[in-house]
Amino acid sequence: MDKWKRTLDTPEGSLGYVVEAGQWIRITDYSGTDIELRIPEEIDGLPVRVLTKKTFLSRKHLHKVILPDTLEEIGDWAFTYCTNLESVWIPKKEMKLGNRIFMECPNIHRIYTYEPGVARDDFGRKQHGNRTSEKQQESRKSEEDQWAALLAAATLMLDAEYLVNFTEAGSVEWIRKWDARMNGVLDMDDSEGYTRMILCGEEDYGTNIDEFIKNKRKSKVRLALLRLMNSIGLSAENEVKLKDYLISHTKGCASEESWEVLLKEYGHEQEYFQLFADIGGINEQNFDAILTDMSAEYAEMKAFLIRYKAEKMESTDFFDSLSLDSL
């Protein structure tokens, strides 16, 4: 008798829901312009247990969502086409998961899991007691951020729904499975899938074989950068493999996808340039050409590279004719 749709106001919109059997809540849909959204644990005194199919379909304003620890099911395509969604907090528990719940969410960078019953702040973070030092909190945060990034990449980069496991995420075994899938992607021939794409009329990588291969390499570069930036549990063997891949496609190589991705997609992020320089992607041989590629838009990063070369690279002859004022 309670099965009619009701609404709950949010700061900038509303959640649609129904009461099931007079005992629990099913969220049916959302409309509005909230950037950050916390789904309540209870509505009308009843636990929120289910996000139905397509609950947040194509909600472009959403950037962050925190799901309640009462949740037991997330339906098919629940967040599909949420193109600006960046992070989600999900309870670390067994639950029924539908198909492709984060399909076509190109900007989802982190999927966090949290222990049910642990107090959270407004952004989903754990609230630590006073006895926990700032250093310990930062260490926890760093590890949590790393495997949250890997969990998001399982769906975004690896197309591995079996890795979207909220109870195992971050465990040694889960990371082993993640890296096994990563290696499968990296080892795949760059031309694999081209014929199928043409026959099926898909255009994700372009219709020219050279363009297809180039974009395949770029996707591998993104994957390698992400794993090195989130290196929790990374074996020495895999670390070498990732670095070698990036170096083999840097500026001055037969193909330069590593440098192209770094400049165009991470051109204002110093930590990525630091990583790329540290592994040898930026070196004495290609330094001049790299600076030439960097327009005035990247003046800050050019200055960083000049300082880096002065401090870390052996030869300083190059700087006899350079100054920061010339940027």
Q: Where are the regions a protein language model picked out?
A:
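Repeat-mediated protein-protein interaction surfaces in helical alpha-solenoids
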Residues: 226-249, 272
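Short amphipathic alpha-helical segments and helix-helix/interface helices
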Residues: 98-102, 273, 302
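Charge-dense, extended regions
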Residues: 275-281, 286, 291-327
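Short, surface-exposed, charge-dense and proline/glycine-enriched linear segments
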Residues: 95-100, 118-124, 314-324
